[in-house]
Amino acid sequence: MNTRFLLLLCCLSFTAFSQPFDALKQPNRSEEEVTQLAEDFKDWSKASNDWRYSFITANEKEAVEDFSISGYQTANDYLRATDTSTWGVAGADARQYIRTVKSALNKLPKYKGTTYRGTWVKQSLLNKLEEGDVLVEPAFTSTSTLPEVAKRFSVVHPNSPQRLKRVLFKVKVNQGGHTIAGLSEYSKEAEVLFAPNAHFRITQIERTSNHTYIGVETVKASAAKNTQKYNLYSGEEVEASFWHSLVCT
């Protein structure tokens, strides 16, 4: 790891701040600075491609490019659906697309460090969460090395009958994160993507009137045994049978 990238990580991750969520609470940096940091991350992503990248196919590249535009919607809708039996041909297409994106991720650079995610989560789930609990995301999980980008995704309240609250995640990436900045159509997002069924252990929670800040770290499924687990999307407790299927697939 060269000196330039170490300096870049310091800038991206706001490591100079002493409090866990300072990077998410500080005023946004200028658009020019954020754009430059995203370009630097894109350059690093391309430079970090190893021998695996030589095996990436044209279909896989196209799938990742499409994922950042609109493909994520179909893929994640399918992965989060409680019943996919009615999807028909669209379901078969979705499954093939998901397999292609997952295959591409395995050939893209791994990322370890800090990322951020902004989203909306059911209030009923937030009321139950405690430090040490594990969140399981059945869909792909998009994060960014730039807190400014993460915050943009939690501005507009989704159209949902559920009571939702804005949540900003700080993610310590130990495993499972792959940068798609070198392929994504939205390279300015400095995106780090996780495959379906990523596991995030809660390390810190800070609740305010407008936001909930949650610090998490990625963990292996096998390391989350005997731990309270929740489906991040549905808010439901992950039961043993479902948990077993995640471990075995």
What is the role of each PLM region?
Residues 8-9, 246:
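Secreted/extracellular small peptides and ectodomain modules produced from precursors
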Residues 19-249:
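Mono-ADP-ribosyltransferase
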Residues 2-8:
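Sec-dependent signal peptide recognition
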